[in-house]
Regions:
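Catalytic-domain carbohydrate-binding cleft regions of carbohydrate-active enzymes
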Residues: 4-174, 179-180
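Accessory, solvent-exposed terminal regions and/or long lumenal/extracellular loops of proteins
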Residues: 172-213
Length: 213
């Protein structure tokens, strides 16, 4: 809610205290929170000054640490897209994190799922905020695929046609993240310091449109 409201009010560079400002550590929740943070204006963990509330990603369990590392790497790899999207926000005042009703306000479903948003023009995210079950900690999230576009799962490349809703289940290491078809997603190889390292290699992911697929 605060992210959506800040976008409505023109405060686009909004971040969260990943892991929680207070309260006991919850490694699974922190992983899911980090997945959301990777598609936010700023990705950071934070808490009040208390040694008992240590939020460093590498002090969680081995699996949780690996899952969070994957998200930090993904954020680094997406930096060309993030940079372009931030420049677009600066130039047009269209939010970086966009509630669905900004682009699809004519459809009532755009107002129904508070967990779903657009990150720039091409990425549709629906982060999971419920605990998982089983050894893989699988959790589900309802996702609406809007418009007449075709959407592709960022992790598996599975295709979903627009105009439908699906219940998506994901293990701890993944979350519902989709790329709009008919566009090219600019990325780069992982680098530990993406903000200060000059771009030398551009990776282009091409996603066919509905007519080309």
């Amino acid at each position: 809610f605060p992210t959506r409201r800040s976008s409505d009010l023109g405060c686009y560079y909004w971040a969260h205290d990943i892991g929680g400002f207070r309260g006991d550590p919850n490694p699974e929740l922190t992983v899911r929170w980090t997945q959301f943070g990777a598609l936010s204006a700023a990705l950071r963990v934070h808490s009040t000054k208390d040694a008992r509330l240590d939020r460093r990603p590498w002090i969680s369990g081995e699996r949780e640490t690996a899952a969070m590392r994957r998200m930090y790497h993904m954020r680094s790899e997406l930096m060309p897209y993030v940079y372009s999207s931030v420049w677009q926000t600066h130039s047009t005042m269209v939010p970086l994190n966009r509630p669905m009703y900004i682009e699809y306000g004519g459809d009532e479903r755009a107002y129904c799922n508070e967990q779903e948003f657009l990150f720039g023009d091409l990425l549709l995210a629906a982060p999971i905020a419920s605990p998982g079950t089983g050894p893989d900690k699988v959790a589900s999230q309802r996702v609406w695929f809007p418009g007449e576009d075709v959407w592709y799962d960022f992790f598996t490349h599975e295709r979903f046609d627009g105009g439908r809703e699906c219940e998506i289940s994901k293990p701890l290491e993944e979350f519902p993240l989709y790329v709009r078809g008919g566009w090219v997603l600019p990325m780069q190889p992982y680098t530990p310091r993406p903000a200060s390292t000059p771009l030398t290699t551009l990776v282009l992911r091409v996603y066919p449109s509905a007519g080309d697929a």
